[in-house]
């Protein structure tokens, strides 16, 4: 259901149409209406799942005019541009002109997760050995599939109606630290007991033996691979920032105040290399670990995550990384 320009706000959602018997909303995104030298004209579209009965009910309401005297219906219908299916080109994004094959993420609409027939259709179109793809599903949510694909596979999948999007699957990346790497640290705080309020940090590890961290940081190893010095340095800096804030302007003779929180540092990087490109990218295994920790530690209500897939996250583009974090934050 494509909206007219300038009707992107949530308040313009065509709720009356989406509540027609047999029609269920399953998400939304932005779309491009037109391109010109002046720029792109964009608006919002809403995804809906339906059946022949749902379409029949909608057709009857439109043709019979039974809701035409309802002001809300009038206002909502007038903001709709078209009702149609996504074009194949709208489902594939983020690939360079030279891309030939590699790791991709396939996103399918929610209802396919409970539909064995549609799932079999998808796997037939995917046509890959079991070690070449990994599927992660969420109750009442999208299905995400990391896979090793080529152009031919993408072209087959693009014609599959339940497909929402396909984009490259980025590898895990921790950004370089900004500012000076070395300066004389202030005097460690007085120990007055471990604060009960705990904050979780997912990163490349932390040196919990440092005087500033040893009483306030608990290190948890979630990967069997030896920590990388640069990743540990990054995680150590993050833990320091959580406990003390910005230290750059503190003098070396100034004693720090005792932190009011303590930190659980979860080292999820580097991930173990197995020879399987999906596992070796590190992204899906890291998401699995983050979800498990957050679900198992309900006593912790705040977490910090300092890494993500390499490259920009396209605005309004759904991925398992962004979806999982949004879901965990609820």
Tell me what each language-model feature is:
Residues 15, 20-102, 106, 110-112, ...:
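Autoinhibitory propeptides
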Residues 117-118, 270-330:
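Substrate-binding/access-modulating region of protease and related hydrolase catalytic domains
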Residues 101, 107-111, 202-204, 265-271, ...:
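Short loop/turn segments at strand-loop or loop-helix junctions that form parts
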Residues 7-16:
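Calcium-regulated, polybasic anionic-phospholipid
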Residues 1-6:
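Eukaryotic intrinsically disordered, low-complexity regulatory tails
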């Amino acid at each position: 259901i494509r909206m007219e320009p300038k009707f992107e706000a949530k308040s313009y959602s065509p709720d009356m149409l989406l509540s027609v018997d047999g029609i269920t909303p399953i998400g939304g995104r932005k779309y491009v209406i037109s391109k010109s030298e002046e720029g792109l004209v964009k608006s919002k579209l809403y995804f809906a799942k339906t059946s022949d009965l749902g379409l029949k009910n909608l057709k009857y309401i439109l043709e019979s005019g039974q809701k035409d005297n309802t002001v809300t219906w009038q206002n909502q219908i007038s903001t709709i541009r078209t009702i149609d299916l996504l074009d194949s080109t709208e489902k594939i994004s983020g690939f360079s002109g030279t891309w030939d094959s590699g790791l991709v993420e396939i996103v399918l609409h929610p209802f396919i997760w409970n539909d064995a027939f549609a799932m079999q259709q998808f796997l037939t179109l995917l046509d890959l050995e079991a070690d070449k793809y990994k599927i992660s599903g969420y109750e009442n949510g999208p299905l995400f599939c990391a896979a090793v694909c080529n152009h031919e596979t993408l072209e087959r999948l693009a014609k599959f109606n339940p497909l929402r999007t396909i984009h490259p699957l980025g590898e895990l990346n921790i950004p370089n630290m900004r500012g000076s790497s070395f300066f004389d640290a202030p005097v460690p705080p007085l120990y007055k007991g471990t604060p009960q309020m705990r904050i979780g940090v997912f990163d490349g590890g932390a040196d919990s033996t440092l005087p500033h961290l040893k009483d306030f940081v608990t290190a948890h190893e979630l990967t069997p691979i030896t920590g990388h010095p640069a990743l540990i340095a990054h995680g150590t800096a993050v833990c320091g920032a959580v406990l003390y804030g910005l230290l750059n302007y503190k003098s070396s003779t100034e004693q720090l105040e005792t932190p009011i929180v303590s930190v659980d540092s979860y080292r999820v990087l580097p991930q173990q290399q197995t020879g399987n490109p999906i596992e070796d990218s590190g992204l899906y295994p890291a998401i699995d670990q983050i979800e498990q920790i957050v679900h198992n530690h309900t006593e912790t209500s705040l977490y910090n995550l300092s890494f993500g897939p390499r490259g920009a996250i396209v605005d309004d583009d759904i991925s398992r990384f962004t979806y999982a974090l949004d879901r965990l934050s609820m």
